[in-house]
Every structure is written in C-alpha cells, then in structure tokens.
Amino acid sequence: MARLIFVTGTSASVAEGSGTWVAISVLRDAIVALGHEVVILAPNAARTTTRSRVLFNLRIRKQLRSTRADAIIGFDLDGVFAPRGRLHVAAIKGVLADEAKHERGMERLALTIQAWLEARHVRRADRVITTSAYSAGRIASFYRLDRERIAIVPELIDLDAWDRALADAPREEGPPRILTVAHLYPRKGVDTLLRAFASVPPEAHLRIVGTGPERERLKELSHTLGIADRVHFLGHLPFIALVAEYRNATLFALPTEQEGFGIVFLEAMASSLPIVATRVAAVPEVVSDGVTALLANPGDESTLAQLLETLLNDAALRQRLGDAGRAHVARFAAPVVARQFMAAIGVT
C-alpha cells in the first residue's frame, strides 16, 4: 500500500474552487478504493487568493518534510516549495499561463503571478502529469519543459455516484432547456452562447449554472438581446440540484474559447446529453464531433445558433449523440483513471 500526499491550495468550496476540488476528491476516493492511503493538505479558507495560496505553500513546508509519504502530488502551482528527497509530482489541471491570456484586469494579473509559480513547480518536480495533449503542449511551450517529460492522465468522473443522483432526480415537464455549466470567466464563451441563443426558437430556455466575474455583464447582455425572460442565471448549485439540471436538460452547450479538459463535458455525457461545443484547445480530445457532440469554431455565433437549433429540432440526433456520449464516458470512469494515474506516477 502506498501513502500519497495531495497538496492543493484550491478552495474546498466548488463555487470558488471550480471543478478542481471535485476532481481531486474523486481521484482521492478512487485511489483509496485501490487500497492506498491519500492525505489531502488544503487550506481551511472558504476562498483563496494568490497571496493566500503562496502563504499556504510556505506554511506546509515543515509538515511535508516531517510527514511520511511515498509521493507528494502537488496540483497546479501548489507544492511548489515541497522539500526534495521524495517523489514529487506536479499534476497540472489548468495551465495558468494559457488561461491568463483569455482574461483581463485583476483576474489576468493574478493568473500571471500564479503561472510564474506553476512554471517553477513543473521544473522542480520529478514527474509532471496533465489532463490532455493540448495542456501538455501548452506546458512545454509556456514553461519551457521537455514535452517527453509530461504524462497525460485525463480527468475522471464517479459514474456510480452520478447514476444514483440521476435516478433520484425528479423529471420536470416544461419547454426545451439548453444547459451550460461554467465559472463565468470571459474564456468560457457564455457571451457567445447568449448571442447565438437569441436566434433559436423562442420556446427554448437557457439555464446557466455557475458564478464568476462576468455574471452581471452577462445578465445585462441578456436584457440587451431581449432574451432575459428565457435566460435563467442559477448561480452555484449543490450536487443534487446540479444533477437535476442535467437530467432535465434537452442538450448541453459550452462554446468555450480555452479549455484544458472540461469536466462538464463528462457530466453531460454521463447524463446522456448531446453536446454543442467548440473546436478548440482540449475539447476535441474529450468529445467527438458528429459522434458525441456538434462543434463550431470559437466565436462563431451563426454556426453555434444553427447547431443549437438543429439539436432542438431533431430528437433522433439528440438520442444518437447522447447514447454515444454515455458509452464514451466509461473510459473516464474513476477506477479506470485512478489506475492510469498510479501508473503514471510510478507508484504501486
């Protein structure tokens, strides 16, 4: 049995920590199910900042030095100051330098500072893992790391827990629903989705799950486009309510402009939903155009609107894409990916 330490400065609040905390928790549980021990070191704060993450990483150095472990796995920039002498793995879920390019203002500044630390982290680590070939290429380019040093292990989903929640979620009658789930940053392309949605049949509704700095601007845009009565900003939802949104959706859409992986696509496929997304970054590695999803080019509002309308009007196509997605998502099941992760870090 191996003993691993996971280090993450990401908030345990899904509303603040995005999908990262969920993915780390699911990975921990799946590795424990294989017979190993996993300890997570994380801050107690409900919300993290660049400053708090740096202080957290400085604060845990002594604890890491004195705690027995076969490997220290630091996620993203966290673990940057881990002591040498034991296997140190940098597990990069978001290439922060890449994300920073798509943001603005203080968010961009914060990501740029964090990216400098993430670069230092991957160069100090014994092994580097990321979730997609796209992200591996970005790490190699932005952080000047040999691409051959980077292993790829995809994100994962607990299909058993998801299926139980789906089965318990009540089915609701009503108009067609387009669902998107995202932290509301510029790079998620929700403004593009709103403009495309303005062209689809008026009986459809758009339901947006997530919070973020773009929320008020997006609300204003929905009013400007004259669709505010059909657009529902739901904020952050707890797990059971989130699954219920997937269960009652007609299709899932996220025209993102940058994505290192996209756990929400796994959630949509696990819910047998057809997907409309963009042909960009890691998205084509997760979904397959014409098989599990219909893809547009990023920023192409006209094509996006056509794809949304096509799926809204074609139940047979929705069924075909949804069924294919459900079959495809099995490759990302937690036990499967946990074994890949352990093999990648070289610990048995």
Segments the model singles out, each with a brief description of its role:
Residues 109-128, 137:
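Membrane-proximal helix-turn-helix segments that form the acceptor-binding/catalytic region
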Residues 274-277, 287:
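Short hydrophobic beta-strand element within catalytic cores of glycosyltransferases
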Residues 257:
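Aromatic "clamp/platform" in nucleotide-sugar-dependent glycosyltransferases that forms part
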Residues 22-26, 176, 180-199, 213-219, ...:
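A conserved mid-protein helix/loop that constitutes part of the nucleotide-sugar donor-binding site
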Residues 134, 156:
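Carbohydrate-associated surface elements
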Residues 289-290, 294-301, 310-315:
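Conserved acidic donor-binding segment of nucleotide-sugar-dependent glycosyltransferases
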Residues 303, 310, 317-331:
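A short, well-ordered alpha-helix in the C-terminal region of glycosyltransferases
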Residues 236-237, 244-249:
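Short alpha-helical donor nucleotide-sugar binding micro-motif in glycosyltransferases
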